[in-house]
Amino acid sequence: MITVHKFGGSCLRDSSDLERISQVIKQTNGQSIIVVSALWGTTDRLLRASHEPRYAGRLVHDLEEQHLRFSPGLAESNIGYLFSNVLRGIETSLVELAMKPENNVAKNRLLAAGERLSALVVSHFLNTKGINSHPVGAEDIGLRLNGKGKAPTVDLESSRNNLDLSSLQGTPVLTGWFGQGTDGELALLGRGGSDHTATAIANLVDANKVILWKDVAGVLPINPRWGIETTAINYLGYGEAMELSRLDTPVLHPATVEPLAAVGIPLEIMHLYQERDFSQTIIGPDIHDEYNIKGIGCLASVAYLSIETLSLEEQSK
């Protein structure tokens, strides 16, 4: 049995979250494949630095300290050299951006460093808890994306032909959000795309299920920004989930469900600190019920425009 777990930045706020993650992995039957986002707030810091690289002098030092607070001993471990390599890569990208701000290759490498650091932190911590884990870079093992620079989705067909399955033995911690673009350079998915990375990997390895661990207990029927208190939807069909993700559901990336619907892999969305008997959302095959409204979505800042024109004959009158 293979379970793909995805832990986002909201589940990587401090070292206590790593303790909880290790408990989750130990309680999972069969093999666990882990996909991670950057630690909470890291991507935003890297993005700001990409806009003002000349003034990001303390960034590398601050990121080093932050990640070592999460996982002490990482720098001295057997993957410490990888940690140093990522930090040096950040410095290099900042220098390249300072010289040429429109260098999108350097910008993407800079932004992807958050996921690389996170994978190292989580993997090292799991090893200290007796879990045989290792970090994996998505583009290094053949995960291909449909685009260059920025890509909408993982290219499942190309990835299936190139994926190095041997690197996914044990308990791998895989970087989310990016992969190899069609031009051979690193490419990024949209923000929140680590969920899509997780479901794409599940499709490629024929996993039994995917669990997206969040700081919310599933998909809510109404966006919480509306200020209406609700409880999570217990079950959504693949089609329903895809429709909600395109409208107003911040929990789901629009491309998340598609790789699972194609092969029937179930998806669970769970709160990291709530047990399974609490609220959660399971996404699976569509169950048609024409009288059951499960959620309400709304696209903000959209206007309806109607244009009427006269025919050439009418205009000539």
PLM regions and their residue ranges:
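Nucleotide/pyrophosphate-binding catalytic subdomain
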Residues: 1-257
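A short linear-motif detector with a strong N-terminal bias
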Residues: 12-14, 246-247, 262, 283-287
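Glycine-rich beta-alpha junction loops
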Residues: 39-40, 216-218, 271-276, 287, ...
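Alpha-helix boundary/capping detector
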Residues: 152, 228, 267, 286-287
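A broad, low-specificity signal marking well-ordered, structured residues that form hydrophobic/aromatic
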Residues: 172, 187, 267, 281, ...
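Short gly/pro-enriched beta-turn/loop segments at secondary-structure junctions
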Residues: 205, 262-263, 298-302
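Conserved glycine-bearing catalytic or ligand-binding loops at nucleotide- and phosphate-handling centers
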Residues: 248-255, 259-279
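A conserved regulatory-domain signal marking ACT and ACT-like small-molecule sensing domains
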Residues: 279-317
